[in-house]
Amino acid sequence: DSDHWTNIKEIGGGRIVGEAVHGIDLACYFFDSLPQSISASAPVDKTNNMVKDNQVFLNINFANGSHASLQYFSEANQILSKERIEVHGEGNSYILEDFKMLRFLEGSQDRSKTFSSGKGHKESLSIFFDYVRDKSQNPFTWEEIKAVSKAAIIAQDHINSGQQHNV
């Protein structure tokens, strides 16, 4: 849908800045580290030779040596989950589907757990109001917000230039 807010860069910043940025932020949370460099690629629409930035591949290197590979697809089959996160390491794998089902593959065990899920709006507002009322500390630092936002903006720039950029 070309008139959707995420596709109008002047309004929503595009798919990377408007949506894929949340994946960058989540990776920072998982690794407890800020991004140091990012590269991105996207397919080119053969009919108009324009980059399809709603189909994006992001590779991010973090300050602590971790690495994340994020793929954002807005044109996938609707049967698939909208959001899928896979974490692999030390012979174990964890797969999170739509933030509702977590599959644990540890050694020879294959277990899963289901969760109720929302969009996080209620929780975000609660955190914000607790901070405004001096009931809690701000869980976000300016350094984190700046690094995640800068990584998303650089990723969009990278798609257009084809070069890796330091964050």
Please provide the spans of the model-predicted regions.
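A general structural signal for well-ordered alpha-helical segments in protein cores
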Residues: 23-24, 121-126, 152-153
